[in-house]
Structure formats: structure tokens, C-alpha cells
Design a protein with these regions (language model features):
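Conserved "HGTGT" condensation-loop signature of ketosynthase/thiolase-family condensing enzymes
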Residues: 1-132, 137, 151-154
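Short, conserved alpha-helix that lines the donor NDP-sugar binding/gating region
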Residues: 146, 150
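Short conserved active-site loop signatures built around small residues
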Residues: 142
Length: 161
């Protein structure tokens, strides 16, 4: 009988209204910064810097994708590059965690709001051996993804999630 499999956290990335990259986001949290601001109708919102996202997407050649797809592809592209892991490997699984999806397209292109479609687009872009696992359960999505990823690795089903 073997012992429990140790799961290591590898390269990561995050983009939020607080910043681009894990270090920038965590520095903002430690500094107790908020990106909450009034929008055109005084509704408080947190928005990702679209100019920075556009520049990042342009660097990676992501024209033709929705804003959410560009965000996911740009973020995951950096992680894949730094990790040395290829999503085409059968022992690799992409987990896509999101709270809302492409809600900006609800009025104009509702079919692009389907998170299952987003997961398929991400998988195709990276030539993934498996369709990405989609986790979308409000603000806990990211933590749920980490827990599920660790369980999938410990089960022996995947080496990298």
C-alpha cells in the first residue's frame, strides 16, 4: 500500500480588476486596495482593464475570441508556457473555473454565453487531450477547482491538472 500522493502547486496566473498576474493581485490585496468603482449608472462594479487585456491578447494572437475567451486563453497560455506541461498529454486536464462567464454577450450573442462552449474553445485552442472540466459555482469556483484538481491527481487519473 502506498502513501498519499503529494500534490504540488505549479505555475499559476490570475487576472482580475485588481491586476494582471498573481503577484500584482496579491500585492493589491495586501495593500487593502479595492477596484470597486461607480459605473455609468452609479452601480458599483469591478472591471478588468480592457486595454491591458487587449494588449495581452494581441501579444498572444487571440483575435476573434470573445472577451472571456481572450481572458482565459491569455491567462492559461502563460501558465502552459511556464509549466512545460502540454494539454495534449492524456495525463493532463485543464480545469476552467469561472463565476459568471460571457455575460456581456447575453443580449447580442447568447450562444456565446454557454460556458460549455467556452470550455470547448479553450480545449481546442490548446489541443487538449480532454475537454476541460468546467466549474462554475459562484465565488467559490476557484477554491472548488483547486480541491477537485488535487483530488483528480490523488486518484491517479491525471498527473497535471
Amino acid at each position: 500500500m502506498g502513501g498519499e500522493i503529494t500534490v504540488w502547486w505549479g505555475p499559476d496566473d490570475m487576472v482580475s480588476a485588481l491586476g494582471f498576474g498573481t503577484e500584482e493581485n496579491m500585492a493589491a490585496v495586501r495593500a487593502m486596495k479595492s477596484s470597486l468603482a461607480s459605473w455609468h449608472d452609479a452601480t458599483p462594479v469591478c472591471l478588468i482593464d480592457r486595454k491591458r487585456l487587449g494588449a495581452l491578447a494581441a501579444e498572444q494572437g487571440l483575435a476573434g475570441y470573445t472577451p472571456l475567451e481572450r481572458l482565459v486563453l491569455a491567462t492559461l497560455g502563460g501558465v502552459v508556457a511556464r509549466s512545460g506541461v502540454t494539454p495534449a498529454d492524456k495525463r493532463v486536464l485543464i480545469v476552467l473555473a469561472t463565476t459568471k462567464g460571457e455575460i456581456g454577450s447575453l443580449g447580442s450573442a447568447p450562444e456565446r454565453c454557454d460556458l460549455n462552449r467556452t470550455a470547448e474553445v479553450v480545449g481546442r485552442h490548446f489541443g487538449a487531450a480532454h475537454r476541460p472540466l468546467l466549474i462554475s459555482n459562484a465565488c467559490i469556483s476557484g477554491v472548488s477547482a483547486i480541491v477537485i484538481a488535487a483530488r483528480l491527481i490523488r486518484s491517479g487519473r491525471y498527473d497535471h491538472v
